[in-house]
Each structure stands twice: as structure tokens, then as C-alpha cells.
Amino acid sequence: MNRAFDMVVVGAGPAGLCAALRLNQLGHRVLLVERSRSWPRPQIGEALTPGVRNIIDLLDANDALETVPILAGKPTRLRWTSEAIETVAHDGAVVDRAAFDAALVRLAQARGVAVLRPASLVRVDGRPGSWRVQIATSEGLLQVDATAVLDAQGRQSRREPQRLRAPRLSTLWAEIPASARGPGADRATRVDALPDGWMWGAALPSGRYRIMFTFDPSMRGDAPAREPETLLRRACARSALFEEMAGLPWCNAPSMCASTPYIDALAWQEGRVKLGDAAFALDPISSSGVEKAMRFSLQAVIALNTWCRASNAMEQALARRFYESRLVESAARHFAWSAGYYRQAWCGESPFWRGRSTPTLTSGLAPDDTLAARVADLTLALQAEWAQIAVVRPPSGDSAPRLPMHDPIRLARDAEIVVVPCATGDRVIAHPALQHPNLDRPVAFWDGVALVPLLGALTRAALPLELIGSLGGSMEPASARRLLEWLWSKRIVEPAAFGANACPTS
């Protein structure tokens, strides 16, 4: 086996596999290390949101996943905003995660990724760009050289002091055999809010039905550890959607895992980065953990590819800035979304729900801890992101007024041009972007076209019809009109008078 690699990826879940496949596409020599002895390994987290399809397309992995069992098109029965049960369409899918992961491992091996399993990371020595990685295998210790190390070990990657954590959550789950529910049982996904937690259930491709109860273990003493089966059955019995399952047999005894959301303040270290749940873990209420893990892995790969191939320290710093900004943005948006969803629960006045109705993260670090500064910086960045999310609201009224095609408009005076790190192709570059109070983040590209060069025509008053013509060299007239309508709807352009002073764009 080769002893020199560009990248060592530790962990063969969706995040690690996505990174390994993408790094391989970019020409890196990749070693994938997986600790699990049983393979394919059983997993929870089978829900796939629609965005996963685009990621699979990018990885050119559709053929490899053709035979993976998947269940899609099932409705969701929901009891959340009120005690009434509603049925809604559901555009996600449930996949056999063991088969999903195994298919991607086979694809990675077929493309030249070296795979060690079962194997585990023992230690990393050396310096950024020149690591000596010690790995424990069934045949003894193995040492390899690597430019960079990517940690995709999920919650098993424990450096908890630097993690900012949301209020505690644990999840209990069990599976009901198909024979116990009968041939005519509905296969709808179910989501139910209870005063002390929430339940989720979904049919699996195997025919089994999985039920899960997510709750705060700190509110229950040691009961979850002592009596997991009793706790899960009682939750079912109290649920309007799961009551019929309270007495059904289970395939195995219930399992329990930690499901507290968090973000790691040391996710980026020079030449060593974290992916997926090792970097930040979502609240399971989103059912989007697989997509978020894979998408963030793609962003991390671009940052690390830039860092490894940078010609100077400024380019490496830009790569880090890109990674950390995407980490903060992804985590902050999810924490804010989760808090908003918790606020909607019909039982929202109970302590479980009140404690999660606003984004709250704590670290438990002492002020003089050496990690405190990193945690403080991360906290400030998250708070700034939350503040921006909070102030960005749709324009007042049911809908924005129509773009006045025959009246002059120009760029609003509170629009600014800023320079931000952007992914273009497989590298991070500094790129000009439009910033405005009505945007939740700077926008560098619109419909695949660099936006800032298009704004020059808007620095002085002009008619929209004329602007559509002047933008014709960069895009189709229909796209130009959509751009102007979008800018108008966001109040980024405003009514103007001919001869008015030009609006600065820098």
C-alpha cells in the first residue's frame, strides 16, 4: 500500500465519503479510514432531503446508487402547530443508509481511493502540510504521510470543551417489524409534538417502521438509561399519531443516542479540518442532517483544495475565511430555523419547548481557558449572523409592487459593494459582492453571472426597458428583467429622477 497521500479522510459516513469522492475528482491522492468492524454498518439518519440529488449529480454517483433501496413519495401526518392532525405532501425520501454508505465506498474504491477498514486514527504528528498519521489496523500500526487530515468521525470525534452546545437532547428509537403492523398499514411519515419532546416515525425500505422520541434527558434523571423501553412506549401511548404502536412488538430493544446540536470552535486548524457532525451537528427535527453534512463537506473540500494549492499565505487565509464563514452561516441558519420551528409547537409553553424557542448556545468553558478566545469569537460570529437573519424581512405588504418599466430607477443608496471569499470552480477567490440590509448575506453571483459588473448601469437613473437592453451583452432579456424585478422586490433599486446624483457602488 502507498504510504504517501495528499488527504487522509477519517470516517466513511456521508460527510467523509462525499469529501473523499470530491477530492479524488480534483486529483488528490486520498486515503479513507473507517473504524467500523461490521459493514455495511446499520445507521439511523436515513432521511434524504431533495438537495441531496444535486450533490450526487456533482459526484457522478447516480449509477452507483441505482440499486440502493429507497422509499419516496409518502405523505407526512403532522401534529405540530395545533392538536389537530394534518396530512401534508413530503418531497424527501428514506434510504437504506447501510446500503447507501456501502455503495459510495465501493465507488470510491473503484475510482482509486485507498480504503482502510477496520482501522482507526491513533495520532497525528508533524506540521500543517506535512503530517505523519498513525493508524491502527487489524495487522498493527501503520504510518502514512499526508498533506491534510479531514475528520469526519461524527459525534465520536470528541473535543467537547470547544463545542458550543444547544440545550441537551437525546433520542430513543426502535423498529417495528412489517408483520406486526399488517399489510394494509399506512407508510406515512409521522411527526408529533408532545409536552416533553417530539416523536418522528417513518417507513423504511426494508418494510420496518422506525419510531423515535427526542427529549431532554436532564429533565428525567436517570430514567432514560434505566427504562428506555418504558419511556418510548409511554411516549407512543401519549401521542395521537403513535398510540396504536405503543403495544406492538419491536425488532430489537430500543437504542439511545445523544442528539444535542452543537458547533465546534476548532473545526478549522491549519491542514486539519472537520466535516459533518464533527464540525457541527443539527437538531434532528430538521431531517436534513445527511444533506447538510454532504453539502458542507463540498465547501470544506474547496477550502482545503485552495489551502493546499495556495501560492501564498493570503490565499491560505482566504480559504480559512471561506470555510469558517460557511460553517457559521450553516450552523446559525439551522439553529435559527430550529428555534422558529420549536416556537410553533402547540405545547410551546412547556419548559422543553420554551428552552428551545430562541437560539441558545453555551460552552461551559472557564473564562481563563486557553480555548475561550476561539469560543468567544465563534459566539460573536453566530450572534451577528442571527442578528442579520432577524432584521431581513420580506417587504411590507402582501407582495412587492410591480417594477415600473417606464419610470427611472437606480441602485439604492444603502447598497454597498464588498469583497468576500467565493467558491468558483474548485478554488476560493476574493470576489466583489452586493451587500444590502434586505439581503441576509452578500450576493456575488446571480443566475450564474457575476453580479457586481451588472450594477454599473444602475449607478445613475435609467429606465428598466433601457437597462434590459444594456444588460443584453451578459444575459438574455428575460433574465435581465428577472434580475431587475428581484432587485426591485428587495428594495435594492429605488425610484429615481433623471439628472440625480450618481449612487456610489464602492
Give short role names for the model-derived ranges.
Residues 37-57:
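Conserved N-terminal glycine-rich FAD pyrophosphate-binding loop of Rossmann-like flavoproteins
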Residues 221-309, 314-339, 345-347:
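FAD/FMN-dependent oxidoreductases across multiple families
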Residues 24-44:
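Glycine-rich FAD pyrophosphate-binding loop
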Residues 305-400:
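C-terminal helical "tail/cap" subdomain of flavin- and related membrane-associated enzymes
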Residues 107-246:
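Predominantly flavin-linked oxidoreductase catalytic cores and closely associated redox partners
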Residues 373-457, 481, 485, 494-506:
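Acidic, low-complexity/disordered tracts enriched in E/D and polar residues
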Residues 53, 57-103:
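A conserved beta-strand/loop capping segment in the N-terminal third of enzymes
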Residues 2-15:
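Beta1/beta-strand and adjacent pyrophosphate-binding region of the FAD-binding site
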